[in-house]
Amino acid sequence: MNKQQNQQNPNNQQQRKSLFAPYLPQVSLPPLLKNGDLVSGVLRINKRNRSDAYVTTESLDADIYICGSKDRNRALEGDVVAVELLDPEKVWQTKKEKEEKKRKKEESAGIDKKKVDKKKDDVEVEGQGLLLFEDDDIVTDEHRPKYCGHVVAVMERMPGQLFSGTLALLRPSSTATKEREAAEKARREAEERAAGIEPKVDESKDDKKDEKNERPKIVWFKPTDKRVPLIAIPTEQAPPDFVENHQSYAQQLFVACIKRWPITSLHPFGTLVTQIGEIGGIDVETEALLKDNNVSAEEFNENVTKCLPPIPWTIPEKEFELRRDLRSTRIFTIDPSTAKDLDDAVSCTRLPDGNYEIGVHIADVSHFVKPNTALDRDARKRATTVYLVQKSVPMLPPLLCEELCSLCPGVEKLACSIIWKMTPEGKTMETWYGRTIIKPCAKLSYENAQEVIDGNPLNAEVKIFNDHNTKEIEADIKLLHELAQRLRDQRFKRGALSLGSIRLNFELDEQDDPIECTVYKPKDANRLIEEFMLLANMSVAQKISSAFPEQALLRRHAPPIERRLNDFVEHANRLGYDDFDATSAGALQESLNSIKDDDAREVLNLLAIKPMQRAKYFCTGTLDIAKYHHYALNFPLYTHFTSPIRRYADVLVHRMLDAALSGEKRFYLDKDAVQKTASHCNVKKEAAKNAQEQSSHLFLCVLLRNLTLQSGPVIREAIVIGVKDHAFDVLVPAFGIEKRVHLDQLPLEKFVFNDETGDLVLRWKPGVSSLEPIPDYDGFGEDDDVLLDVDEEALLADDHDDYHYLMDVTSRPSDEENRLFDANSDIGDDDDIDDDIIGDESVEINQETTKTTVPSVSIHESPKVDYNSISETTFNQSPAKISPPVIKINELPQLQIESDPDTPNSQIIRELCHLQVVITADCKKSPPVIKVLAVNPYA
């Protein structure tokens, strides 16, 4: 290590201390991994406490715990890392010793213990999403990790990874330290003057003045994602007046990237990419979340557009010779009303023998996207269309996804079709696969189809083409619905599981501002399409895995995380469901179905998602066949075939199916290339899902802010879904949000937690609104950054007051480490996604339904408040600076509460009880923060 350090710092007169171990050379990793000396996996960092990280690996039956920044060794969220295993007992003992040392350091520094606790259970981080993340990522004496390790190399990193954030002149902890020192000095001088002692004049004052006037060499970039460290940025890359006017940039969002991270530096060095705009605006926050999730929203370049066919385009004559002609077959699409990329259609033909031909017809994207072209490479790089509330970011150019490939009615289209001969009971007798030419006769929305299922006529506004009529389509919809119901019943009898995730629909005005919101509920029309898409995907999986047992791209879903599943079952037992069975997907579904109480079923359905793992793409030749299984669907083989316009994995599967039907012995990509594409699609699919959820969160925050400004505090009913000793978790059904209510933010005189019953007894301060500021809690400030830095630094070295080594711009990492941050790293230009793991297809089919007109959410008419004199900026300030309007309980709809007869002004909080909460949104933070407070029933 010392030799490498000397080589990296040849001009150093004084050897600087190495804070991290150098990475092992990439060439040395394969044999070490093969021999089991190292294991590889994907790193994730705890959102509440970035000192805790975990590596998920196929090699072990549990995650590897990475304790502290030093053992994480400069690895970032999502990196593929090589890990050397360590003795868990030794790691745990070291962790306890460091925590004790850190605690003493905090006490000596005068850091408020309450804020230390707040750092561990970060309200701001909790408020940046719609749902809570997992508590059991936090290791404790009761939940010690099974495996521990340290990162010895970063094997893969997302190329060109960007981060949104803010700029600061000084490192946040340095600023806070100087403020504390100044306050301490002022206090000491005041005491001296009171004692008649003249304070000593600082003789180095002039020197400090000169030091102050010296222009700093770096400024600090603070990413909005707390899992990413502060990044040192050269001052010349900041705005020209930043040093003099840095306070005026406090609310400006920038984008930066990491360029290098020397082993002698606590923080990485980076480059400022661009300035986005002011925090809080929908456009600015949307651009930020796209950057944070590495979503490419740039226009398609000239090399890509050159691959597109000339317009007008017609189907070549030779295709009529090679394909089955289905133009006269009654085929129609059922999609969200706003959908433009129509990539799936269905058909139903009655046969003379009483059986049916049921067809699923998918846009033949692979006809236009040829392997190893610029268009193909760009589609692979993007990997998926990203659906936001107000827009989508397409995987393919609009000419393809909205015109040539989209199955528009009345137009001849190229398709890949699967046609089953099916009995009236839904039993498949034969399956036909092949390329076809179709001419859809109608474009239906889910609402149109649902009206027919409900017994109403098809909406007269639906245009019918190709000499077909409304009655025929109505009959087809009803028959498809009946068959879908039978298929669904059979699927669940075989042991399938469906846990619907909470999704929001927004109605937007002409400026794309949210005006209404509701929780999305799937209907029979959605399930109709879902069942046939699932059947198509399963059928194709069987075909391609049979043809290419070593090269097929499939999709698997691993069983739930055992410890989390056990905790969930214990939770169900506490609620009185002693016979709750979660030994299989089918058993879990039956247990949930047996719950009669609506609240309990809704809560347990939500909590059952938390032990589940994400479904993932994989290549058959790289994994043991025992791991192919899809847990939730209970399918032995499954893939994605039905959405090639918006998923690159489906494009590859189409090519595999075509190769299988052509009788090819081997697919054109080997198993390593297929697996590399599968892994890339997994990463991009996860990023797309995160972006979609963050977009919904952003629009909900804006809606909550607007409702508050218009009508006063937003108050809704909530269900308690979990109780802790200092907090309780609630579900707010009206907005589909899950939040933690912290007791130290409520106007309580005292509270008592009963370990035996798991109940909380709150004693409220009478006449005090929950929105009035709490003296001991003044919101978020720079001290939160101090605590994060104290935590990180304590794990690295004893003395981090002097950051002179960060100024060393001569220190260079190895070429291999440099390439980790290289935006031009080849993710596969020359080489050759998960929604909630449950209801896999139903979630994806309806991604565009987030921007629709929906029934209004009832807005509680609280006492009107004159906000004309309060600017938006003032309203979003810390509660310590402005007192919101007082809420009186008698002005709200009455809600029965349970109280303790021995405690005045009391309220008992237990699981499944209902209470009123006030929901606030702070749009002056990025991402914006939602906070939920229990309403004081005695105010």
Predicted regions and their residues:
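Electropositive polyanion-binding surfaces
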Residues: 204, 226, 235-240, 250, ...
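Intrinsically disordered, low-complexity domain-flanking/linker segments in eukaryotic proteins
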Residues: 91-143, 174-215, 461-466, 770-899
